[in-house]
A protein has these predicted regions:
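Low-complexity acidic/polar repeat-biased segments
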Residues: 62-163
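Acidic, glycine-rich calcium-binding repeat modules characteristic of RTX/beta-roll
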Residues: 1-68
Length: 163
């Protein structure tokens, strides 16, 4: 369990292998910082995108000027946000495409954010490169943000690079 000191706190992750943390005091002033080297088969200039689709939506890299976001924030409430099976089942309509219909075929990784309106889970997603969809075996839970609704998460809550 992690708690901040009030004000703005930074929670640091160097990779997807550190295990799942429970952050008890995450707030709008706080930052999740990742030193992980995300794949870059596409431009990664877009830090975060919000998806309000009931089970995720199709993300079209072509309509995003060739950019693949590092963070996908899913704001529809997911009662099973804390299990990999619950997340992969919930995101049944989400997939990453190059043009709206052609699934990506390269290995990509990203952060997936999903919650139930009260708590939020942060997942590392390492797409196998076969279809651009989220599979249970491709997910690693990084953190649970207790009493934080991801609907209010913005790019200011996420940073990249070393400490």
């Amino acid at each position: 369990d992690l708690t901040g000191n009030g004000g703005s706190d930074t929670y640091f992750y160097s990779d997807f292998l550190e295990g799942a943390d429970t952050i008890r005091t995450f707030s709008a002033a706080d930052t999740l910082k990742f030193a992980y080297n995300f794949t870059n088969n596409y431009s990664r200039n877009v830090t975060i995108t919000t998806d309000s689709g009931a089970n995720g939506s199709v993300f079209n890299i072509g309509l995003s000027s060739g950019n693949l976001p590092i963070v996908f924030n899913f704001t529809a409430n997911n009662s099973n946000h804390s299990s990999s099976g619950g997340v992969s089942n919930f995101l049944s309509n989400f997939r990453v495409t190059t043009d709206g219909s052609t699934n990506i075929s390269t290995v990509e990784d990203a952060l997936l954010v999903t919650g139930n309106g009260s708590n939020t889970s942060i997942w590392g997603w390492q797409n196998s490169g076969t279809n651009g969809t989220v599979e249970q075996t491709e997910l690693v839970r990084l953190a649970t943000l207790n009493s934080y609704d991801n609907d209010s998460m913005t790019a200011a809550n996420v940073a990249f690079g070393g400490l």
